[in-house]
Amino acid sequence: MITRRDLLKTTALGFASLGLPAWRREEKIRLGVASYSLRNLKRPQAIEAVKACGVTYVNIKSVHLDYKLSPEELAAGRKEFDDAGLKVVGSGNNSLNSEKDIAMVFEYAKNARFPLLVIAPKPDLLPQIEEAVKKSGIPVAIHNHGPEDKLFPAPSDALKLIKNMDPRVGLCVDVGHTTRAGKDVVQEIADAGPRVLDMHIKDLKDLMKKDTQVPVGDGKMPVAEIFKQLVKQNYAGYVNLEYEIEANDPVPGMKKSFDFMRKVAGEVAK
């Protein structure tokens, strides 16, 4: 039996979806910006650039909220993002090479109200990082950096070390670095399952070469297959564009990337 409450709920959902594209209506793929993409822009200009891309989610690099800021300055800087209507979904990448780094970065995250930390840690510090996660309640996502990274070239290199840790110790899958490490990126995501807490997306004309990055959709990255796998495993995190090229004028290429990804996300959401 359909109750009046059920009918009202269904009607409200129907009206809410009118006029919205499928990717936005379902938002099974939540697209955002890794602010490293905007590293040559000051904070106010970076905020405007994110808005120009038509997205609301942003992962903040320390270039836009410096580690050295006081708690009050961090709060004020964070408020600039909030006041612009942006949702801050994390911070990173953050290098954790010592116990001092761990203490500093988690305090930084607390003061800036970051809900997640993308990290590049030393493996022998993982137990201390896990304890910091438990104490603070702030999840961490280990970022892989491809063949140049002797510690975590691919997500699977980190996964084997954290598989028995607190579930809030997870991975930030960088799809470009993953393919350059010679891995099947879709399989890496599937194997990691719920440990995937964050993602950096980019595209490459040659999936093995770092210097071939192009706007997403212009290369060979299997974006549709990646999105389908994320939906299949009920990924609840964000897909943040890390646009590492054209640093002095990144917005046109970023817009082109988002246009493509929205179309793909819309198909996946059907």
Segments predicted by a language model, with ranges:
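C-terminal segment of N-terminal export signals and the immediately downstream linker at the start
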Residues: P21-L41, Q45-A49
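Conserved, mostly hydrophobic/aromatic
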Residues: V33, V50, F81, A109, ...
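Catalytic domains of carbohydrate-active enzymes, especially glycoside hydrolases
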Residues: A46-K61
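Active-site acidic/histidine proton-transfer and metal-coordination neighborhood
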Residues: A12, A16-W23, P44-I47, H64, ...
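Glycine-rich, proline-tolerant flexible connector loops at the mouths of alpha/beta enzymes
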Residues: N59-A76
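C-terminal helical cap(s) of enzyme catalytic domains, especially alpha/beta-barrels
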Residues: G253-A269
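N-terminal secretory signal peptides and thylakoid transit peptides that target proteins
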Residues: M1-F15
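Gly/Pro-rich active-site loop or hairpin
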Residues: I47, L151-P155, T179-A236, E244-P252
